[in-house]
Regions:
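N-terminal subdomain of lithium-sensitive/metallo-dependent phosphomonoesterases centered on the IMPase/IPPase/PAP
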Residues: 1-94
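DPxDG-like acidic metal-binding loop motif
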Residues: 83-111
Length: 111
């Protein structure tokens, strides 16, 4: 795994700090809207995915791709964006989708 150069960490810190603020506004705009729920598991078991999961992941991916176009992105809902970069972003747009579905505010995003 590559080492982030000492002077580069500020770029990532600033980006993630701004992304967190943008995500808060984006999530807040979506919370009062209805969403569709489907089961990712076909057959046995239940693993919900919502239209919000997909919208949030698209939003996060777009921000990362705009700032770091060569970085690899691995997302729970849309898989990998392959790249030759040594840098990878891993996204779970709604960690705690079951809680999100029932209106329990104990969910978050993971980047």
């Amino acid at each position: 795994m590559p080492q982030i150069k000492k002077f580069n960490y500020k770029i990532y810190y600033k980006f993630l700090n701004n992304l967190a603020k943008e995500l808060t506004r984006f999530y807040t705009s979506k919370l009062s809207k209805s969403f569709k729920v489907t089961n990712k598991l076909k057959g046995r078991g239940y693993d919900p995915v919502t239209s919000s999961d997909k919208a949030f992941e698209r939003f996060i991916r777009s921000k990362i791709t705009k700032k770091f176009p060569n970085h690899q992105i691995i997302g729970e809902e849309f898989g990998k964006k392959k790249s030759d970069s040594n840098y990878s972003w891993v996204i779970d747009p709604i960690d705690g989708t079951r809680s999100y579905v029932i209106g329990n505010p104990s969910w978050s995003n993971l980047i």
